[in-house]
UniProtKB/Swiss-Prot annotation:
SUPFAM superfamilies: L9 N-domain-like, Ribosomal protein L9 C-domain. It comes from the Bacteria. This is Large ribosomal subunit protein bL9. GO terms for cellular component: ribonucleoprotein complex; ribosome. Transmembrane segments: none annotated. One of its GO terms (molecular function) is structural constituent of ribosome. Pfam families: Ribosomal_L9_C (PF03948), Ribosomal_L9_N (PF01281).
Length: 150
């Protein structure tokens, strides 16, 4: 019996795959537990439509990520921070991914999720710093920060 997997099933198939499985296994396990549905011509057509829509959505997300990268790669795109500095040259507060994301939105109107900004630890130094940001699995950019003394 041909089925379309609705979820990943270890050793049998991944979500969206069409595979031939034993009839009893399909009816008694996969279909009952909503892990798969019977592959009729109508359900195969629905699956192809969903896959095309998903590909189109992924292409739009990739294009948006590339547009954000183009803005971040410009020399004039430098996020300005003014922080109070102690006698040892370190800032009193620290600059976190959340703060960087908010300032980027405020200064340039570019929205970047704070979870995409790759910071090993919060920034506490002054000067020019480049922070990597993973916009998409295929697109990585750098945010330029200019941290000055207030």
């Amino acid at each position: 019996m041909k089925v379309i997997f609705l979820a990943d099933v270890k050793g049998k198939g991944k979500k969206g795959e069409i595979k031939e499985v034993l009839t009893g296994y399909a009816q008694n396990f996969l279909i009952k537990k909503n892990l798969a549905k019977e592959a009729t011509s109508q359900s195969i057509g629905e699956l192809k439509g969903k896959q095309k829509a998903e590909e189109k959505a992924q292409a739009e997300i990739l294009a948006e990520a590339q547009a954000v990268k183009a803005v971040l790669d410009e020399d004039k795109t430098r996020v300005q921070f003014q922080e109070k500095v102690g006698p040892d040259g370190r800032t009193f507060g620290s600059i976190t991914a959340k703060k960087i994301s908010e300032e980027l939105q405020k200064q340039f109107g570019v929205k970047v999720d704070k979870r995409h900004i790759v910071l090993d630890h919060p920034i506490r130094a002054i000067g020019l710093i480049e922070v990597p940001v993973k916009l998409h699995k295929e697109v990585t950019a750098e945010i330029k920060l200019a941290i000055t003394e207030a």
